[in-house]
Regions:
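Short, acidic/turn-prone active-site loops that include or flank metal/cofactor-
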Residues: 34-36, 75-78, 99-100
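Rossmann-fold NAD(P)-binding glycine/threonine-rich loop
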Residues: 54, 61, 74-95, 105, ...
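Rossmann-like NAD(P)-binding element
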Residues: 41-58, 64, 69-74
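Extreme N-terminal starter segment of soluble prokaryotic enzymes
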Residues: 1-4
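Hydrophobic beta-strand scaffold residues
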Residues: 28, 70-71, 93-96
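C-terminal substrate-binding/catalytic lobe of Rossmann-fold NAD(P)-dependent oxidoreductases
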Residues: 6-7, 11-44, 119-238
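Structural motif
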Residues: 7, 50-51, 73-74, 97, ...
Length: 238
């Protein structure tokens, strides 16, 4: 039975805990708001972190110290956090994603397939989340932007205002309100036609289930940095 430690006692942490309770092959080793100093976390096979960027480097250091598999879903990360993740991946298997839903992983793959024809369209990204989400644009929006334009060949325009002609750009728009679990759309706007790819999350359960799929994948893997693409399509010698 795979033993999971959850870091982060918020909405996502609670959703992961509920899903663990429904799985016969998983057990909750413990849960904490921050990385506990006690050795109890050492009993875990996998750490799942949905806490806060201020916690990310400490979580990475703990996983690296013990060689414990880490599933990292915290968003709003900066370059310093990403350096911590890369260092941890030298000592432990780390699955890092801004979104653990299967649908978003497929979405990302579809966008990568669109790169060869993306120059034929203007592109806009629209995302919506609940009123409590702090970072904007969402980590998932950034993930989708990287999938369609990995070399940053188009300027990102965050929101629109004022006057001026459209340039070589991708518009990015964030909506915050209510209890929206997460909605993401990428619009390809061409001459006399519009193609829209859209994903809507009905609840946080899809992210929790995806994180547990990632945990099963990471357990026993060699140290390295993995993505949901690796988890679902068997990358890095899966």
């Amino acid at each position: 039975m795979l033993k999971i430690w959850i870091v982060g006692r918020g909405r996502m942490g609670g959703a992961v805990e509920a899903e663990i309770a429904a799985c016969e092959d998983l057990a909750l080793a413990g849960a904490s708001e921050y990385v506990p100093e006690a050795d109890s976390i050492g009993a875990a096979d996998v750490i799942i972190d949905f806490s806060h960027p201020n916690n990310t480097c400490a979580v990475c250091e703990r996983a690296a110290r013990d060689g414990t598999a880490l599933v990292l879903g915290t968003t709003g990360l900066g370059d310093a956090h990403r350096q911590c993740i890369v260092r941890a991946a030298q000592k432990a298997p780390v699955v890092h994603s801004a979104n653990f839903s299967t649908g978003i992983a497929i979405f990302e793959r579809l966008l990568a397939e669109m790169r060869g024809v993306s120059h034929l369209f203007d592109i806009e990204v629209v995302e919506a989340h609940h009123r409590y989400k702090q970072d904007a644009p969402s980590g998932t929006a950034k993930l989708l932007l990287a999938a369609i334009d990995p070399e940053n060949e188009r300027e990102r325009i965050y929101g629109r205002g004022g006057m001026g002609a459209r340039g070589n750009e991708i518009g990015v728009h964030s909506i915050r309100g209510g209890t929206v679990a997460g909605e993401h759309s990428v619009l390809f706007l061409g001459e006399d036609e519009v193609l829209e790819i859209r994903h809507s999350a009905a609840s946080r359960r899809i992210f929790a289930r995806g994180a547990l799929t990632a945990a099963r994948f990471a357990a026993g893997k060699a140290p390295g940095l993995y993505s949901m693409q690796d988890v679902l399509w068997g990358g890095k010698d899966a």
